[in-house]
């Protein structure tokens, strides 16, 4: 069984620790990770939005853990360096390729968002993990019979259409129109899960929609 600790998920921050050793996303303060950072071996990053990428936290992780590896795709290499993470601690990975870290194997896959973003497939001694948030769809991506899926289920179609109609009527700014283009609905992710899950698979809905104009 894969051990996980969700420190935050949603527009206010995202950070998940897997098997006490792997941090996926880093959208929280260093203080929030104070009890776990010493055991971390690997950080997997997805995209630049501040609820997933906190430069100060990343710099402090690198300073306090000089052997910690930071894995990302090319679009996050410069932001990591600008944050203060030494180049020697950064691994730039190519989407669609598997990489070995001893404690696990990982593979990033590009997904559609309003900035470059990736999902992570992680092969652990405890099982296979698929992690993805902030995506419009998972077209072309499969992860059959994984043990755990941690995936975005951002909104219910009927509820968000009702919010859009209400805001149109009131002449308000309709943030939800952007949500439709940049995030995954409950219905779409359920269809994808049903097509990929095995009999013993488990799933967790992540990054559920909050009715705030500053969500990302």
What are these model-derived regions, one by one?
Residues 1, 7, 58, 106, ...:
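Extended recognition/assembly regions associated with phosphoester-bond processing machinery
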Residues 1, 42, 56, 63, ...:
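Catalytic phosphate/metal-binding cores of nucleic-acid and nucleotide-processing enzymes, i.e., regions
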Residues 1-36, 118-134, 148:
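Conserved beta-strand hairpin/beta-sheet module of binuclear metal-dependent hydrolase folds
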Residues 8-9, 26-28, 48, 75-76, ...:
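Active-site metal-binding loops of divalent metal-dependent hydrolases
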Residues 15-16, 97-152, 156:
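Catalytic core of the metallo-beta-lactamase
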Residues 29-75:
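Active-site metal-binding motif and surrounding structural segment of the metallo-beta-lactamase
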Residues 75-82, 211-215:
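Short, charged/polar "capping" segments at the starts of alpha-helices
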Residues 143-216:
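Cap/insert and terminal regions of metallo-dependent hydrolase folds
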